[in-house]
């Protein structure tokens, strides 16, 4: 689950980290009032969406009057912001963050992720702040500094100081950086985060360090023990199909192809997408129906897949372990009839009673193509999607 910038900064403030004074507002009038509360003569107004690249898309602006802040809020509230990280429809803006202006002398980067290879939290820092860190890592990896956190003792101040020296910080900045480093590490662990970024972490004109942005992603598997963070969830930022799928315990991710995929098991689902690509097709989604491929779940899965107007054919790839393939076939037939599927459906069944399942499909009289293997299924569905 992602958090908005204003929510991330709220957590930063709770851990004593330096952030700008600001208010999240949802009306133009509140934007003007926020300027009065903050004081000063310059403010930064930011559209709140779960996507980067807001500045280049016009979603971040420096304003010098309350009227300009009000106008910015009126421009974006209730509208969709399109950035390089969103699809063509963009993300809806329901909050505007109004905060004090910061004099920036230099921009740095500081972030943390869970490194699966070392099974540790790893911090990354760089002098290349304010830009796409993935681009920096690809083009100049030597500019990415790393510190691995020992789970037994946690982040240590000396690690923060070491990074600070490598970043060229000096004097009071070293201690400030170490405090931010340790605070972020505690926040990361306490809230079961999967990713945390401060981009940029800036050196102000007076030499102090300041967290100018906050990007936080929480591990979805740990949400059951983070009741406070559950209240931070903004459903308007979720893909409607993904949110609907979650209600039925279906793992769905929308993609940009035209071949719908329905599979039981995440690994098999990824393998299915790979082989579709191998044969020249483009998956329209990742969809894992899980271990219980019942008629009800298959029906909902079909509804979700076919809600994408780009889908020209559907590939169903099911491995029958405990569940018999003939029962799965009956479920698929029932779902196709109930939903009224108009596009070709290619089904590959393997496992318990697979032959009987294929026979049931063949005798259904529906537009269902029974494949003999995964390769055959991929070839058949690609042809079907092309209208051949």
Curated annotation (Swiss-Prot):
Amino acids binding Mg(2+)? 199, 213
Name this protein carries in UniProt = Succinate--CoA ligase [ADP-forming] subunit beta
Top-level class of the enzyme under EC nomenclature = ligase
The UniProt keyword set, sorted, is:
ATP-binding, Ligase, Magnesium, Metal-binding, Nucleotide-binding, Tricarboxylic acid cycle
According to UniProt, this protein's pathway is: Carbohydrate metabolism; tricarboxylic acid cycle; succinate from succinyl-CoA (ligase route): step 1/1
GO BP terms, alphabetized: succinyl-CoA metabolic process; tricarboxylic acid cycle
**What organism, scientifically named, is this protein from?**
Pseudomonas putida (strain W619)
Q: Where does ATP bind?
A: 46, 53-55, 99, 102, 107
GO molecular function per UniProt: ATP binding; magnesium ion binding; succinate-CoA ligase (ADP-forming) activity; succinate-CoA ligase (GDP-forming) activity
- Please list the residue ranges annotated as the ATP-grasp domain: 9-244
Q: How is the cofactor bound?
A: Binds 1 Mg(2+) ion per subunit.
Gene Ontology terms, cellular component aspect?
cytosol; succinate-CoA ligase complex
Recall the taxonomic lineage recorded for the source organism: Bacteria, Pseudomonadati, Pseudomonadota, Gammaproteobacteria, Pseudomonadales
The record's similarity note reads: Belongs to the succinate/malate CoA ligase beta subunit family.
Gene label: sucC
Catalysed reaction equations from the record: succinate + ATP + CoA = succinyl-CoA + ADP + phosphate; GTP + succinate + CoA = succinyl-CoA + GDP + phosphate
- What EC number(s) does its UniProt record assign? 6.2.1.5
